[in-house]
Amino acid sequence: MLSAEHRAIVKATVPLLESGGEALTTHFYKTMLAEYPSVRPLFNQAHQQSGDQPRALANAVLMYARHIDQLEQLGGLVSQIVNKHVALNILPEHYPIVGACLLRAIREVLGAEIATDAVIEAWGAAYQQLADLLIGLEENVYVEKETATGGWRGTRAFVVARKVKESDEITSFYLRPADGGELLEFHPGQYIGLKLIVDGEEIRRNYSLSAAANGREYRISVKREPNGKASNYLHDSVNEGATLDLLTPSGDFTLEHNDKPLVLISGGVGITPTLAMLNAALQTSRPIHFIHATRHGGVHAFRDHIDELAARHPQLKRFYVYEKPRHDDEAHHAEGYIDEARLIEWLPATRDVDVYFLGPKSFMQAVKRHLKTIGVPEKQSRYEFFGPASALD
């Protein structure tokens, strides 16, 4: 039980987390992944090496400590965590491992003089409160997905019905249930989890669903990353007829249905969730402005599909920005990068729009800044990270 004294102690550690939280979480991951191999498949080693995962956890721990008296203020963060956990099939038995390693990291990084028995006790109680909250919320989602039409719990086998090269870097996989059963619906913008065995090692990854729900199959579109263990395995070793283990669709970066003009802005492989949103939005009459930035035509996936949609749907306007176009690239609307002048030109005159954007972090930082400058309300601009969440400001 988290007492008033526990809360006071946790809040008193906020300055320490602000200055040293990342060192603490880096030590935490190093310890946990070395000593508990059972949890390694749940974490992307590239995100560990880049520091993105420890940084994201440090921010989450800090936010929790700051709002320990008003957990309702964590609503958005809690929802993101629950969705990520469900897509990876995080289970109650994983939480004691995390808790033990977190408390150990607090003691070892802060030292016994600061991380006294009282501090460890307070953080132990605080962690248990958070774990109980997440376990309960996640169980609700697991039950909801298991009992829904076409739903399941844990993994379900899917067959690769088609494998299609979309660009020099991106390949799509069309996945149908191996049991021939019904398919769980999903919301445009959500992702799905894959459980893979690569070189004898289990790994789990999340990939955006890149086509609107059709009741027959899911589509993921995977960019080959130079050192990506999962993406290279999918590109090189998974062919039509292969079977993959999928976890249920998840994610809270989803299309909100209303009559406002819709603006979809993507960079690189960030196009994948916006495609599902685009296809769903075209079932309505709302105006759509689709803006995509990429390096050049060779890595521009789905161009023919979007051009064909624009030819059939007058409500859709699309704009392409090539950073370094090749001499034989098809026509594009601008060279370089998306900037304020181009957004002013390409967006509707009204700033009462709904904007969804996704891409590399530096791309999203620039887009967020430009949208704010030209007057798009911040509450109507939504974004998501591939991988651990971070701050754009």
Curated annotation (Swiss-Prot):
NADP(+) binds at G268, V269, G270, I271, T272, P273. Gene3D superfamilies: Globins, Nucleotide-binding domain of ferredoxin-NADP reductase (FNR) module, Translation factors. It catalyses: 2 nitric oxide + NADPH + 2 O2 = 2 nitrate + NADP(+) + H(+); 2 nitric oxide + NADH + 2 O2 = 2 nitrate + NAD(+) + H(+). FAD binds at Y191, R205, N206, Y207, S208, F385, F386, G387, P388. Residues 150-393 are annotated as: Reductase. One of its GO terms (molecular function) is oxygen carrier activity. Consists of two distinct domains; an N-terminal heme-containing oxygen-binding domain and a C-terminal reductase domain with binding sites for FAD and NAD(P)H. This is Flavohemoprotein. The gene is hmp.
